[in-house]
Amino acid sequence: NLRDSHAARREHHAAVSAASGGPVKPHRRPNKLLRRVAAGAMACVLTALLVVTGQSVQSERVVNVCSWGEYIDEELITQFEEETGIRVNYQTAESNEALYSLIKMGGADFDVIVPSDYMIARLIEEDMLAELDYSHIPNFDLIDDTYKNLSYDPENKYTVPYAWGTLGIIYNTTMVSGPITSWDAMFDPQYAGQVLMINNSRDALAAALLDLGYSINTTDPGQLEEAFNLLKNAKDSGVYQAFVMDEVFQKMEGGNAAIAMYYAGDYLTMLENNEDLAFVIPEEGSNWFVDAMCVLKDTQHMAEAEEWINFIASTDSNLANMDYIWYASPNREALEQYPAYYAEVNEEELDPEIYEIMAPPAETLDRCEIYENLPKDTLRLYDRLWTRLGV
């Protein structure tokens, strides 16, 4: 019984807290791992169904969605299908760069994608996105103005924000010598073999740039070469156990690595399964990002795509998503209502420190930069440096 399990968990933490003389980090529902497995199984079933039914699927209304792992409450997919009769083929990509390659090579049949800000700007620049008809997406009015008309889509023709968050360092407090405060930890030989570096070029080089005191949007080849050398030296000296994306969950939850560079919302998911984990936005600053829904220009399912986007942009969908993915909502009603929603669903108050990690205050975001779409010459340099790194 989930409710009894949750109550027992609270009693256990209270006992631990009393014995230790202080509070322990809160956990939420203990069933996230089961839901993660179920989500993967559901994705396999959806894909298999599309293959097996073949021609019959062609006569159905369908929308093909590509997003990130651990990035939707899958019950929303079921609800949308039941309410609309539209079949959702939901797939995932590991990174913005991997998503771009899939689209560019023509090997992907996506309608709706959910890239990050800088990749959206690139897709717009390369004329790969369709303009949206916002009269078909009335829930766009619920998106806070803070997340409209941003640099990646200044006239707001192509996107509806999905979620926002920050990039930082996750660490196991039992496996490090003290609290981590700097990006130095990602390059520190004292943690050789215990560090997980993120497996995409933009974020990995950003860590090195920040550690060196440079902007994550620099186009200076000398600064990028210096950042590359910092990263390469750490790799060659055995600092990194692995370069990872979704594998980070298992490794950090299982205590198989001490330090990882990853996203705040995913840290909160990991915290459910390992209370020894902590998160920090380093003193040098970091990246804060907005992921947004958009539609590829060659879509054959524009009506279905806009219906899906409108459904996901609703307050109810955003509340459910926040409670599942632990990322902040751009929907102003959902962001305001979430602490009360959490308390009702989980029968306990939301820890203010947890909420601050999920939705950082302005003074934290002021230390962070949004990724800009870089010039083509700089993007080519990133590609060359990443190839030289040999990940």
Where is each model-derived feature located?
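Early extracytoplasmic/lumenal segment of secretory-pathway proteins
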Residues: 56-123, 250
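Extracytoplasmic ligand-binding site segments that recognize negatively charged/polar headgroups
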Residues: 109, 114-256
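A ligand-binding cleft/hinge motif common to bilobed small-molecule-binding domains
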Residues: 119-122, 253, 259-276
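Ligand-binding "clamshell"
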Residues: 124-131, 148, 152-157, 269-281, ...
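A bilobed periplasmic-binding-protein/Venus flytrap-type ligand-binding module shared by bacterial periplasmic
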Residues: 168-175, 209-213, 289-302, 309-312, ...
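Conserved C-terminal helix/tail region of periplasmic/extracytoplasmic solute-binding proteins
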Residues: 358-391
